[in-house]
Amino acid sequence: PTYEMTYKKKEVIRPSHLGLELAKDKHASNGTNEQDLMDGFTVKDTQTATFDETWRPVWGETATIRNHYNELAVTLNQASMQRDIRIRFRVYDDGMGLRYEFPQQQKLNYIVVKEEHTQFAMTGDHTAYWIPGDYDTQEYETVISKMSEIRSKMKAAITSNASQTQFSPTGVQTSLQLKTDNGLYINLHEAACVNFPTMHLNLDDKNMVFESWLTPDATGMKGYVQTPFNTPWRTVIVSDDARDMLASNLILNLNEPCKIEDTSWIHPTKYCGVWWEMIAGGKQWSYTFDLPSVNLENLDYSKCRPHGQHPANTENVKRYIDFAAKNGLQEVLVEGWNIGWEDWFGHYKDYVFDFQTPYPDFDIKYLNDYAHSKGVKLMMHHETSGSTQNYERHLEAAYSLMNKYGYDAVKSGYVGDIIPRGDYHYSQSTNNHYLYCIKEAAKHHIMVNAHEATRPTGLCRTWPNLVGNESARGTEYEAFGGSEPYHTVILPFTRLQGGPMDYTPGIFVTKLSEWCDNKSYVHTTLCGQLALYLTMYSPLQMAAD
């Protein structure tokens, strides 16, 4: 099957192929007799529909959002395998989405996806605003170049990160923003990525064709699917006015309505916290230098000598609480409150944290009581060190602890390579982990701000307790040499298409030497930092320093 797309009589997508390559795998219903879902189809049925609604987001930039589209659902029969698939298109004034649908059938019950081959054939050598394709990180600076220059600029675009896995010299990530010579703005992304890997794009730079490239898991396969099943939407937003790209709600509209019945506990939040003084290099997340390694099952921190550089302590956190109360901030984040930070990173270690036990100098009950007496709440911090399986083992107890002391929001982190070992940050299984945490948090009336997780695809409509994601190069990099001045004015067109970003602005002390021995300067002005609160929309905003 193929499709093409025009906008105001201008060609946007040239005829482009659709389909999925399936593995001849013993876990599939058809085993080694499996055939690809690429060709050999005949049209069995077509159905059209029009839909128009106005819905109210729990939070957002507007009080209401209109969801108005025309729909075409094409059922295709693959006679050689005696099975049907459906490709559904939804067309909006500002773009379209398409997805593959697999009704349950005898010959289409369990399938193993080897690769998806959804193409986006461009009409020319457009200007692209891109970051390197990577299975583990989105924390790259945006490169502005012609599509034909991606290959030559890729090596320089790849900068060091705690966990990174590139896959192609012309592979890029979505949301990908493009600008044509004839005045069109085009954005390629995905919506409603549920139980499926994150999609990247690989460029055939001879023919100017982008093709989907899914994130594998540790087995090398891309997805294990039980029908009935729908893939995420593959989206194209288009306009001849750049401002329309920022106003588009296409990604949100392609997601399911809110699944949380009572949303009264979900609220916008301004916060400060114990974070920047560690990022800038002056203080430590850890409590002691006595330990060459940590075994949480057999360790008494009360016998360790504190190194005196641990800001997540009772007296210092009280200062932040007082500041928040005085300045109208609702919450105070405290990183480094819990035991285990002495060897938390870089060892592929499974049991790094228990997410429940504070260091000796952090009085969790007293500080929460003190904060509540001031009309402020503490914000929880759960760094996983990439061990999703350890986090899931402790998740119920960790969320219950939050309920016990009155926390209503958590900042989670996934720094480092993913455990189970060999998996990636954006695989099907890891994406399922992120959503599992969000769903479990909703049961406990907890809002989630996930850092180092997969880039958002509009799931905050369905699960509005997902109030923030990082999923891009944020303010912390200003302590590591900084970002290009244009970085923050491109992100709204790229990263923010799928949902808000916890960019953590609010750096007013721009000479880092005032914090520590760091000789870097924050590449900003006071006015620029204040402007970020408007241009980088999020219901969750930090006053970082």
Where do the PLM segments sit?
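Aromatic- and carboxylate-enriched substrate-binding clefts and catalytic-loop regions
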Residues: 335-521, 525
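N-terminal accessory beta-strand-rich subdomains and adjacent acidic, glycine-rich linkers
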Residues: 1-261
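Short amphipathic alpha-helical segments and helix-helix/interface helices
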Residues: 117, 164, 173-175, 321, ...
